[in-house]
Amino acid sequence: MYVTFNEALDSSFGNLESPNHDFKVGDPNMVPTPPMDSDSAAISLAFLISLSITFAILMLILVVIAAYVTFCGDDESEYDEENALGTRTSGTLHSLFGKKHSGILLDSSFASPGGFDDEIVLQERELEELPKMSAYEVELYIRAKEFQMMSPPMVKDFGTYLDSDDQQFIKDRGIQSYFLLPSINDNIDEYGNFLPSFIVQDKLDIQFSKFNKSSSTVMNYPLPHNRKDAVYFEVKIFRHIQKSNSIFSIGLTTVPYPYFRVPGMAKYSIAYESTGKLRINNPFTASTLLPKLEEGDTVGFGYRYKTGTIFITHNGKKLMDVTQNIGIDLFIGIGAFNAAYTRTYTRDGLLEDPDNVSFREALSEGKDIEVAKDLQRVHDPHDESDEMTSDEVELHVNLGQVGFVFIEANVKKYAFGSVYGQIGIPPAYNGTEIKKDTILQKGEELPPRYADTDNFFGSMKVKEGSSSRITAQTSKPLWSVGTYERISSNFDRENNVYHDSLETDDNNTDNNVNNNDENAGCNENSPLLEDDGNKRPENSNTPREVSDGAINKNPRNKSTKKRQRNRGKSSKKKNRSRK
């Protein structure tokens, strides 16, 4: 075996050294060729293909995640001015990729009041809270409870409240179709005169008057579906003095809602109170979770269709998501009440409020507690001598007819709809089209000239006398008939010659007046025939001036002319006889 192997090795080296080969064993540049594997190319190609497929799948997953976060995630940044703990919305993808909420997310007790349905729990709460209230607060609580027993709230699925006619009207008119309901005739004086608790101006502007004790109003239509992610509205506080005795609430309610109760204090209602309290179906003590509202602030409420979430904004910043899974028709609700009639918001109630830490600290340190004069004690609204006038509050509602303070609502178009609907803008009455009218422009360039006198005929005063005689007295001498004719008639002015200096016969005047009938007297006594310059009598029958060639048909005038002619003839005869 060993010999055979050596022989084979020698023969191999001998073949390498033979002249038939291009290289020799001693050649230093000789590199042995490795054996070629026929499957290596196929293996490398398969590896590259698998690697590209893996990267493609990863890219596809990233694109899907990015698309979901962009279009299905939260639309705006979250703010937390109260330093509250944040939570995440439900759902696997939301938990993994959703944005982290910095606001407070409450349960869905808004749609399911909970404690109100349990009579035992409600009775225990009433026994605890009602003694802390004033008589007027207890009265309002009982009235609201009876009201909702007689008229239960309409808890319908979102978008089912409106009929086809209302939907078409909203499409046609847009935001112009929405308005706040007017005040109920609740407050009257001893004479039966209506004392409105509030006045609605321009459909969406509300002003609570000094007669207000406790009242509220709602919108005529519920929140619409604007084909966007959410719907949003804002309320601007135009008037609310500091240390006011009026407290107002802004929120969402169902209908019918007690008109004498502010939002948030009855079933199926949520409200942002001006004191900073957040009320959800809570007529009792509420927690202060929000900033206090002052004049100039803007409060916003939004509703997300997909998750049924209600969120609140303050001066353009989102505060929190209040509740979720709300799928019913909601109406905008605004109300106000006089805090002087309550114990909760007067001195004693404020000291018992656990959120008023500063009051208790000041009281423990012996410092004076600054409370408004009207809120030092509880007043009785049923006692006329103890009634308090409410401080006026003015609020303006913005449904999208102007820009929102909340920027994201403008970008995402969360308005209630178009401003003018499908009908469009009404005709313009600002004068832009009228200015193009040539005739009207000419009329503006050449305005008509009016007389400086008191009326059309001058400063004329008429005194009534007997039926047969009417006298006229004027501050200025009237024109004669000839002067009047020359002014009034172009034809007479151009073709006739007038003589205004004719003399009158005073003796014939009085006789002629007695002989004429009433009609003749009235015609001859016209103010136009009176000429103070010639000193004519009132009822003078002197002949009128006539043009050249005109014939005077008055017989008296003819007799006068004959006498003048006879006098002329007699004078001529005398002259001849003298000669």
UniProtKB/Swiss-Prot annotation:
Residue positions the entry lists as glycosylated: N212, N356, N430, N507, N557, N575
Segments on the Cytoplasmic side according to the record's topology features: 1-44
Glycyl lysine isopeptide (Lys-Gly) (interchain with G-Cter in ubiquitin) crosslink location in chain: K367
Lumenal side, ranges: 66-579
Residues of the B30.2/SPRY domain: 166-364
GO cellular component: endoplasmic reticulum; endosome membrane; fungal-type vacuole; vacuolar membrane
TM stretches of this protein: 45-65
Localisation: Vacuole membrane; Endosome membrane
PROSITE patterns: B302_SPRY
Single GO molecular function: ubiquitin-like ligase-substrate adaptor activity
Biased composition (Low complexity): 509-525
Example of a GO biological process term: protein transport to vacuole involved in ubiquitin-dependent protein catabolic process via the multivesicular body sorting pathway
Major location (coarse): membrane
PANTHER family documented for this protein: RAN BINDING PROTEIN 9-RELATED (PTHR12864)
Note: Present with 450 molecules/cell in log phase SD medium.
Recorded family membership: Belongs to the SSH4 family.
Function: Components of the endosome-vacuole trafficking pathway that regulates nutrient transport. May be involved in processes which determine whether plasma membrane proteins are degraded or routed to the plasma membrane. Confers leflunomide resistance when overexpressed.
UniProt name for this protein: Protein SSH4
Organism: Saccharomyces cerevisiae (strain ATCC 204508 / S288c) (Baker's yeast)
Gene: SSH4
